[in-house]
């Protein structure tokens, strides 16, 4: 314990509420902060066997071969019209080939589960989501071993009354799990890369995500990641859960994986609880600590706080988030932030680690460079174990 205290005394700057100014970009009061949010021990960290199992029966699956402007289908449960392939029944669907200015849609019963296996797929949709999960109970997006897959969308969407909130290259109104060992590149020119309006679970795969005007991996109710390799470059948040209406939702749980995150605003943001048990993280947010709150002369930096593109940070929803300004934190939670393991290298314009409520560190190795606070807890801070080094901070 003494060695941890020594590290803290030598290199840790910790700001608690009332101990330092928050400048003009202070955390705004959010619904999440006023909720009696559950603790980091109480969130649902369960990841089911089906989420982790990327196996499939090729002999019984429906095969969809994309052929440029159309598709051929062998099996039941899917149809094609004018470059739009629609999956309508529960089952496993093997998808291969290229679709130019087309779309893959899931519109099954809300009690049905669908597995989509990508086998060297390229889909580009100029004016809508490349993969639109309109309805289902749950969809498993499996990246077949040894395959390279790409989903892209254009810079503007043509939306109607029934799809006015669609804002991702992958957009799901059902629970979405991404697994397998293949690779997936997601290129978002409009807003976000991957959006689930329910749970978003990732258990494997290699992901290269670019979203200049939006975010990377967004799950409304929660984001759970147990494995995978992620390179994410975004204009807003790289990973986010944003349900502020329910105390047991809006959380992010990560237990493993490698993460190279470059975010215009927050790198990982949870409306309620952010819990990380393991993983390797290389994080840059808001341009990094060089974009600091205080300039070299000791004066407030006039441009500090102008992070991200001039567009909404959160995926389209019914005004669930009440933040009135963006932030550019490394790790951010609305109620509780718990670090229990992992290796972190965080270079942030804003606070490197921030919670409006509590911060608990019981493990992990942290190397922090901050343009504002190193670690900020609005209510309480507990450090029991771990190695923490802050080489730069301004408050």
Indicate residue ranges for each PLM-predicted region.
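A composition-driven surface/loop motif
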Residues: 5-395
